[in-house]
UniProtKB/Swiss-Prot annotation:
GO cellular component: cytoplasm
Name of the protein: 1-(5-phosphoribosyl)-5-[(5-phosphoribosylamino)methylideneamino] imidazole-4-carboxamide isomerase
Organism: Chlorobium luteolum (strain DSM 273 / BCRC 81028 / 2530)
EC number(s) reported in the record: 5.3.1.16
UniProt enzyme class: isomerase
Subcellular localization(s) per the UniProt record: Cytoplasm
Keyword Isomerase: yes
Amino acid sequence: MLIIPAIDIKDGKCVRLTRGDFSQQKIYLDNPLDMAIIWRKQNAKMLHIVDLDAALTGEMVNFERIRQIVEELDIPVQVGGGIRSADDVKRYLDMGVGRVVIGSAAVTNPELVRELMKTWRASKIVVGIDAVNGVPKIKGWTESANLKDFELAQRMKDMGIERIIYTDITRDGMLQGVGYETTRRFAELAGMKVTASGGVTNSEDLRRLAGLQYCGVDSVIIGKAFYECNFPCQELWYNFEEGICLDHNFSTARKR
């Protein structure tokens, strides 16, 4: 199972929210690039980046910060947050982003997905479904869609989408355990590749999710649990290494 660290960017800083609530925002680092380098040094094979400002406003205000991360690292980066047009997608993919995550637009403008699938390979476009009790939430989780989560997934599958990033909002940022049953139900009904997200707290959560590979769950995005050092290996790195060097020319970075 592929483990993907998450980086959320708000006002240019690396933050984490609790259940998507912007009033419950915690800043972890002022420079998201430094955070990306830390995760890469801890053996990340992919990063998941969300532009929270873009999700709120539709303006890609953190585009250059994301570009820095993409150019600096030697691993794929997937990006979501406020991507609402084919031009937005093209800007990110032309810049070198590995894949783009379509969120609310999959509900509000499904023709965008159809258009994208005519232009890009399925590996470049994924859809994020964030749900509460099986109902997708859109527009920063402020509105509910008029269909079930698995129904939305099946519509996307019919358009050529092969992967869904599925977030159980009730668990997101709570550090109270992954939404195992909701993820299992969704994956079984969707019949697609699924990246699980929301609530992963410890190694036991990862073991449980690994048991869902039979229904397509092959990867997981981890946010707050990493930032709060919930995994023993992180304590080793932080306590016994002589500091994590944030030299942007570390050995795995691309040479400029």
